[in-house]
Every structure is written in C-alpha cells, then in structure tokens.
Amino acid sequence: MVFDFKKEYKELYKPKAKPSIINVEKANFIAVRGVGDPNAENSEYKQFISLLYPIAYAIKMSKKGDYKIDGYFDFVVPPLEGFWWQEGIKGVDYANKDSFNFISLIRMPDFVTKEVFEWAIEETTRKKKKDFSKVEFFTYDEGLCVQCMHIGPYNDEPITVEAMHEYMIEQGYELDITDERFHHEVYISDVRKISPEKLKTVLRHPIKKK
C-alpha cells in the first residue's frame, strides 16, 4: 500500500475547522526560499515552487531505477506547505504582500537523508537540464502550535487567525513567532481546480506557555 501522509497524519493535514493545540514533531522537507508577493506575475514564489516537484518525484520514482534507498517505501507526494514572514512584523500583514519572505516546502519520508536528497538533485539536474541549486534539504522541529483548518479564500485567513489566537489565550498560551518559528500554511486544496470559497488551508502558529 502506498503511504499517504494526509491519511497517516490526519492531525497535521485534516484538522477540524476550529482551533486546536498540537505538538508537531521534527520532520525532513525539501524547500526553496524567496521573497515578494506570491500572486505577482513571474513571482519568485511561482518560479521556485516549480523546482520542488521534480525533486520529490525523483525520490518517489527511484524504485524504478538502479539507485536503491535504504528503508524506501512508496508514498503519495504530500501537499505543498509554506512558512511566511515579514521583517519587523510579528505575524502577517496581508495588505503588504510585497514584503513577504517565504520558505516553500514538501515533506519527505524519514528515509530521505541529505545523501538521498543530493542524489535526487544530481539526477534531476541531469535529466531536466535545469538548475535546481535553489532547492535545499530542510529539517524542522516545529514544536507546540495552535492550528485550524481555514476554509475559504486566502485573503480571509485573518478571520481564522483571530479565532486561533483567542483560543490560544483561553488555553493559557501566547504567540511565539520568532526568527525561527513562522506563520505556517499547508495547502490541502489545488487552487487551480477549486473555487476560492472551498479552498482548504491548514493554518498553524507557534505558541508557548504564558
């Protein structure tokens, strides 16, 4: 059976549309970093996320080649995720998207080591005749967070974020966004196929005890 992160880790990919507290364990990702409005034409965001999928599929499809990965199992490539922040702002200013910094990520199974990642970069560069040097191997220990499934357009996220923060305070926590802990989005829906009103996005904010 093909391993599906969305089914095996429902608490991470299918939370309810009401806030909850979760402890997210350390995981490996492939990632790209950039800046600017993600919706702008020819944005770094649109250009860079297209670099992630060939690497993810090279690892997934390695089963058909000569390169054998220790502990390999077949898997569904997980949803795209994103860390977002703006310099000098503790949170997200949706009215000033040009100042966004981002790390876009796709989670990888634990058998994906730095060595496996480097093989995938080399193999994909050779096959695609394209530069994948912006893609990096990224290990992240997210820790304690408040999260909620946001249903609707991205521009309506502040409504869900406000509910998350109210719940967080009620439970005795406070926001802990820092230089290493970010506003986190997990894109469950394919924006190309679903109307904005039905988009599902997991929103996650780092927290700490008061």
Language-model-derived ranges and their functions:
Residues M1-K210:
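A solvent-exposed interaction/effector surface
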